[in-house]
């Protein structure tokens, strides 16, 4: 089921719909489904989306590792957006 999330990241309001969310004792796994095949270069908007979801969930689950996946439906591939990519996406949002 889709999970709605809302909160603030670096003082900015954020709201979204997570396609699938799995929480266990050590991890929080976020999966977002994208139609089509995996592109050769993932759009920056998708990195930002997953970075913002992860930042919100890290506030809720500070003791768990947040893992973010893009699931491409056409070719059934999964792409993990790792912490470094998420951090870079958040840094690109910072003013100045």
Positions of predicted regions on the chain:
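Structural signature of nuclease core domains in nucleic-acid processing machines
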Residues: 1-96
